[in-house]
């Protein structure tokens, strides 16, 4: 079965993103296809490379990145929600005159079209 996940909670402070990541791992372990994860609203904070958890805490941002690198899962973040919350790639940082970007490698700024496409091409879309 082909799945897409929507994450609306931040990397830290709520259980949503952590539960979504565990669900993603379980899907892959059971042989399902996870085509994409779409980060929306507060979920865009999962793509902030400046997040720095304590050394004894789970690093969710880099774990999403590993999921992308190891399994080819697309990590799309809503561009409008990201810009509102200060998560930018190099292109947007330059366009906005910002000194630097903070989008973690492996994540892509995307429009809601990426979510619409996932909902049309996947058997299931699960929101956390």
UniProtKB/Swiss-Prot annotation:
It is an enzyme of class 2 (transferase). Pfam families: DsrE. Coiled coil: none annotated. GO terms for cellular component: sulfurtransferase complex. It is found in: Cytoplasm. Its EC number is 2.8.1.-. Part of a sulfur-relay system required for 2-thiolation of 5-methylaminomethyl-2-thiouridine (mnm(5)s(2)U) at tRNA wobble positions. Accepts sulfur from TusA and transfers it in turn to TusE. This is Sulfurtransferase TusD. The gene is tusD.
């Amino acid at each position: 079965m082909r799945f897409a996940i929507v994450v609306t909670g931040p990397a830290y402070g709520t259980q949503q993103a952590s539960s979504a990541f565990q669900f993603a791992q379980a899907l892959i372990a059971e042989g399902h296809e996870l085509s994409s994860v779409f980060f929306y609203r507060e979920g865009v904070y999962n793509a902030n490379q400046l997040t720095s958890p304590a050394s004894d805490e789970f690093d969710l941002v880099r774990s999403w990145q590993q999921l992308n690198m190891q399994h080819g899962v697309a990590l799309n973040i809503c561009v409008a929600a990201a810009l509102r919350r200060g998560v930018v790639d190099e292109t947007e940082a330059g366009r906005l005159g910002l000194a630097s970007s903070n989008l973690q490698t492996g994540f892509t700024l995307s429009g809601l079209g990426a979510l619409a496409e996932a909902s049309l091409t996947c058997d299931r879309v699960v929101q956390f």
